[in-house]
């Protein structure tokens, strides 16, 4: 569950039942002319989306 999409009430409720918050981080840098600058940010976010699909609402993905 992406924290960015929750309102403050939903976030407070989620924190009462979820004990895992993950912060995907990465550098913004060039990886050649063929890759986007955000490659190191895009990959961890996608990885967490796949984990979320398996875990359901058992983790919060922080911005």
Where are these regions (language model features)?
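N-terminal catalytic or cofactor-binding beta/alpha core of small enzyme domains
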Residues: 2-63
């Amino acid at each position: 569950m992406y924290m960015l999409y929750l309102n403050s009430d939903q976030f407070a409720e989620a924190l009462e039942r979820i004990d895992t918050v993950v912060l995907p981080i990465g550098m913004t840098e060039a990886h050649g002319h063929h890759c986007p600058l955000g490659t190191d940010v895009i990959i961890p976010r996608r990885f967490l989306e796949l984990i979320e699909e398996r875990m359901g609402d058992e983790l919060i993905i922080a911005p």
